[in-house]
C-alpha cells in the first residue's frame, strides 16, 4: 500500500513539473528530424540538493505512451546518472525523439540494477521497489501539436526520496 501511495505522490509531483513544458515553433527550432504530423519530445532531468555524496540511478530506457502509437521508446541517453550532478539549476537531456502528435499520457523511466547511494564514503545499493519492473511512472497528459518541440523537466528530490529502512537498506521512494 505504501508503494502505491508513494507512486501516486511521485506521479503528482512530477506531473506538476512536467506541465512546465517549454514549447518552440519549428521556425525557432530548425530541427530537420521533425516530420509532418510529429512533435519533438524531450525529457530533461534535474535534482534538488540532498545530504548524500552520490545518488546514482541507472537509466536504461525512457518511453512515453501515445494515443496514436501506444508505447514509444524515446532515443535514450542510457547510463548511470548521479542525480546530485544536476542540482541548482543544472539539468541534463536524458531522452529525445520525434513522436506522432496527439496525446501523451505517461512517461516511464525504465531503470537498471546499478542504482546506488553514497553515504559517508560508503556505496550502498539503492532499491527501487515501486518501479523495478515496469519503471517509474509519470502521468503527464500532454496534447502535442505538430511541429512544436516539447521539453519536460523531471525534478527528482533525492533528499526526500531516499529512505533508510530498519534493516539498513536504502530504497528510492520518489516524492
Short names for language-model regions:
Residues 2-11:
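Bacterial N-terminal signal peptides that target proteins for export
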Residues 24-175:
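A short, solvent-exposed, low-complexity linear motif enriched for acidic/polar residues
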Amino acid at each position: 500500500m505504501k508503494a502505491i501511495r508513494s507512486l501516486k505522490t511521485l506521479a503528482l509531483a512530477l506531473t506538476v513539473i512536467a506541465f512546465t513544458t517549454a514549447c518552440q515553433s519549428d521556425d525557432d527550432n530548425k530541427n530537420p528530424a521533425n516530420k509532418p504530423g510529429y512533435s519533438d519530445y524531450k525529457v530533461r532531468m534535474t535534482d534538488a540538493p540532498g545530504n548524500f555524496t552520490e545518488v546514482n540511478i541507472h537509466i536504461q530506457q525512457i518511453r512515453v505512451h501515445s494515443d496514436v502509437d501506444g508505447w514509444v521508446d524515446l532515443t535514450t541517453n542510457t547510463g548511470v546518472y548521479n542525480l546530485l550532478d544536476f542540482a541548482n539549476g543544472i539539468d541534463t537531456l536524458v531522452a529525445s525523439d520525434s513522436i506522432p502528435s496527439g496525446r501523451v499520457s505517461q512517461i516511464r523511466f525504465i531503470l537498471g540494477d546499478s542504482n546506488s547511494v553514497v553515504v559517508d564514503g560508503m556505496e550502498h545499493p539503492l532499491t527501487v521497489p515501486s518501479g523495478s519492473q515496469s519503471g517509474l511512472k509519470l502521468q503527464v497528459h500532454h496534447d502535442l501539436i505538430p511541429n512544436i518541440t516539447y521539453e519536460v523537466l523531471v525534478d527528482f528530490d533525492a533528499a526526500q526520496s531516499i529512505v533508510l529502512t530498519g534493516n539498513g537498506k536504502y530504497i528510492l521512494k520518489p516524492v
